[in-house]
Curated annotation (Swiss-Prot):
The keyword Iron-sulfur does not apply. The keyword Lyase applies. GO terms for biological process: glutamine catabolic process; pyridoxal phosphate biosynthetic process; pyridoxine metabolic process. It comes from the Archaea. It comes from Methanocaldococcus jannaschii (strain ATCC 43067 / DSM 2661 / JAL-1 / JCM 10045 / NBRC 100440) (Methanococcus jannaschii). This is Pyridoxal 5'-phosphate synthase subunit PdxT. The active site is at residues 75, 165, 167. It catalyses: aldehydo-D-ribose 5-phosphate + D-glyceraldehyde 3-phosphate + L-glutamine = pyridoxal 5'-phosphate + L-glutamate + phosphate + 3 H2O + H(+); L-glutamine + H2O = L-glutamate + NH4(+). In the presence of PdxS, forms a dodecamer of heterodimers. Only shows activity in the heterodimer. Catalyzes the hydrolysis of glutamine to glutamate and ammonia as part of the biosynthesis of pyridoxal 5'-phosphate. The resulting ammonia molecule is channeled to the active site of PdxS. SUPFAM superfamilies: Class I glutamine amidotransferase-like. One of its GO terms (cellular component) is cytosol. Pfam families: SNO. The lineage of its organism: Archaea, Methanobacteriati, Methanobacteriota, Methanomada group, Methanococci. L-glutamine binds at residues 46-48, 101, 128-129.
């Protein structure tokens, strides 16, 4: 199985390492033609407005939107998968959620902690200017991770979105296995 990592911005190498640790092959996706031959795509963290603009500029936005690929979005990737953020920005709008950007504050407010993750128990989450799910717009959306009363992980069909960075934790590879089992192979 080949999992592509959108390589426009963010911690691409860390995602590639976590994918390999989970037992899959990783491939950088920088251009439209790089989408060929992948079984799923990861949209990493970074700055969501910049990633959205660059995806549009490089022709990736519509291609990804219409690709039917299973997608895991982390941090900014969650924002890009959402239907809205309260500001005008380019989004894929593939998941029936709205998000609050930077819900935990600024860069200096970043933190790490264990969170509850469906079927995995406790998973270590790294939160960096992280968003949270503000509203769930459909019964098709399933909450899979929480930080107290905050929704930090959701799944809808072949799409999964996380507020945190699983690629930055030792046990994060389990989240990639969960994504493959619950979104890619379904």
């Amino acid at each position: 199985m080949i999992i592509g990592v959108l390589a426009i911005q963010g911690d691409v190498e860390e995602h590639e390492e976590a994918i390999k640790k989970a037992g899959y092959e990783a491939k950088k996706v920088k251009r439209v033609e790089d989408l060929e031959g992948i079984d799923a795509l990861i949209i990493p963290g970074g700055e969501s407005t910049a990633i959205g603009k660059l995806m549009k500029k490089y022709g990736l936005l519509e291609k990804i939107k219409n690709s039917n690929l299973p997608i895991l979005g982390t941090c900014a990737g969650m924002v890009l998968l959402s239907k809205g953020t309260g500001i005008n920005q380019i989004l894929l709008e593939l998941m029936d959620i709205t998000v609050k950007r930077n819900a935990y504050g600024r860069q200096v407010d970043s933190f790490e902690k264990e969170i509850e993750f469906k079927d995995l128990g406790k998973v270590y989450g790294v939160f960096i200017r992280a968003p949270v799910v503000d509203k769930i717009l459909s019964d098709d959306v399933e909450v899979i991770a929480r930080d107290g009363d905050k929704i930090v992980g959701v799944k809808q069909g072949k799409y999964m979105a996380l507020s945190f960075h699983p690629e930055l934790s030792e046990d994060g590879y389990k989240v990639y296995k969960y994504f493959v089992e619950n979104c890619v192979k379904k």
